[in-house]
Amino acid sequence: ICFSSDQVYSGSPEAGPYTEDRTAPGNLYAAQKLEMEQRVLDVLPESVMLRAEWMYDLSAPKPNYLLNVLRAETALSFSPRQYRGVTYVKEVAQNMERVMALPGGAYNFGSETKQSMYEITQQLVRLLGRQTPVTPGPDRHNLWMDCGKAARQGVVFRDVLEGLTQCLADYDLLPQRREN
C-alpha cells in the first residue's frame, strides 16, 4: 500500500470530478507521485496506490485546513470555483483494514463533495457559531476526485462537511453540544 496524492490531477483542463484513469500532473511533485505509482505497479501489480487528499485532525502537529479555520482571526479566503476533498484522518485509519483487501491498482481515497471550498468554509464557520468572514478568493485548480472505485470495494468516507462535523464532535467543539 502506497500513499500518492490528488495532485496527479493538478494539470487537468477538465473541471472534475476525476476518475483514476484521467491523470494529468501539473507540477514536478505530481509527476513524481504518478511515476512512483507506475514504477511500483510495474514491479508489484497487486500493490494499492491511494491518491489521498488533504487530511486533517485536531491533534496534528502541523497546520491543516480545519486548524486554520479554527484559529482564524481575520477573514478566510477560498475560491468559489475550487472543488476538492479534505479528509478526517480518523476515517483514513478506520478504512485501512478494507484497503488491505483491495485489488491492485490506483484508487482515489478520501471524502467527496459537491461544494466548493468557499461554500464548505462558509458552512463550517456557521456550524462553529463564528463570525469569521469568508471571502471569495482567487481561482485555484480543482482537485475534485470521484472516489467511487474505492467505495464499490467498501472503502467509504463521509462527505467533506459530515467528516468535519464528526471531527468537531469527537473533540467536543460543536457549540450546541457544549451548551447542553
Model-found features: residue ranges?
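SDR active-site strand-loop-helix element
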Residues: 1-6, 50-52
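Catalytic helix-loop patch of NAD(P)-dependent Rossmann-fold dehydrogenases
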Residues: 8-50
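Short glycine-/acidic-enriched loop or helix-start segments at secondary-structure transitions
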Residues: 10-14, 59-60, 88, 118-120
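Amphipathic alpha-helical segments that line or abut small-molecule/effector binding pockets
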Residues: 90-98, 165
